Amino acid sequence: MRIDVISLFPEFIAQCAAFGVVGRAQERGLLELQGWNPREHAQGNYRRVDDRPFGGGPGMVMLIEPLRACLDAVQAADARPAPVIYLSPQGRPLTQVLARELAQLPRMVLVCGRYEGVDERFLAQAVDMEISIGDYVLSGGELGAAVVVDVVARLQDGVLNDAESAAQDSFEGPQGLLDCPHYSHPATHAWGDVPDVLRSGNHAAIARWRRKQSLGRTWLRRPDLLDEAGLEKNDRRLLDEFRRELAPGDEK
């Protein structure tokens, strides 16, 4: 997969993508990440990329032409079609479902805004989709782009050392539940012990415990997800069991 990122700070994206899963994806040739700076396509001695908004008001707006020329260069660099995605708090929320859709693409272009935003005409004519990583405002789209790169990279075949790791993540699977708790060594600690069932070697019992915990954790923390999960009879039974076993004060 190839991801092109248009940003006034492409080195920021490169640094974020140099480590961990995304860095490994690039090393293995499973992800190609390329940064593009619209300032390099701006005209004049100052290579200006922003100006004051028509109608007045605070802040500056990114200009059409540097962005358009930069996008032209991006599209000329690879003949494969690629959706142009603008990172914006007004966009479609980034979910695991959307991440899986994006991960199937051979290529995409991410556009990072700055200042008060981008000239609306560029968004209307050049952008195919706007994506939001949350209901808050950042200084620019770079952090959002880094999130998209990470979530998409880890879904590429061969990136994770254990393919089951992604399949068991929160929001994965057809019902999109939260993940169950995980434990490692030591088995006994001052802060608590590992549940006996996880040390039993009984794979069926372990699978049942994990499913129950996943259902229960979703009910406690994201009950809205259960409304869309369409739980079957056995899952409803496990959730009822979780509720009965819940200690007073654990509803957090």
UniProtKB/Swiss-Prot annotation:
Entry-linked Pfam families: tRNA_m1G_MT (PF01746)
Record keywords: Cytoplasm, Methyltransferase, S-adenosyl-L-methionine, Transferase, tRNA processing
GO molecular function list: tRNA (guanine(37)-N1)-methyltransferase activity
GO BP terms: tRNA N1-guanine methylation
GO CC annotation terms, alphabetical: cytosol
Catalytic activity: guanosine(37) in tRNA + S-adenosyl-L-methionine = N(1)-methylguanosine(37) in tRNA + S-adenosyl-L-homocysteine + H(+)
Main location: cytoplasm
Annotated positions binding S-adenosyl-L-methionine: G113, I133, G134, D135, Y136, V137, L138
Disulfide bonds: none
EC number: 2.1.1.228
Compartments, record wording: Cytoplasm
Top-level taxonomic group: Bacteria
Stored InterPro entries: Alpha/beta_knot_MTases, tRNA_m1G_MeTrfase_C_sf, tRNA_m1G_MeTrfase_TrmD, tRNA_m1G_MTases_N, tRNA_MeTrfase_TRMD/TRM10
Record text on subunit structure and interactions: Homodimer.
Similarity-based family: Belongs to the RNA methyltransferase TrmD family.
NCBIfam families the UniProt entry points to: PRK00026.1 (NF000648), trmD (TIGR00088)
The name this protein goes by in its record: tRNA (guanine-N(1)-)-methyltransferase
Organism: Xanthomonas axonopodis pv. citri (strain 306)
Upper taxonomic lineage: Bacteria, Pseudomonadati, Pseudomonadota, Gammaproteobacteria, Lysobacterales
Gene that encodes the chain: trmD
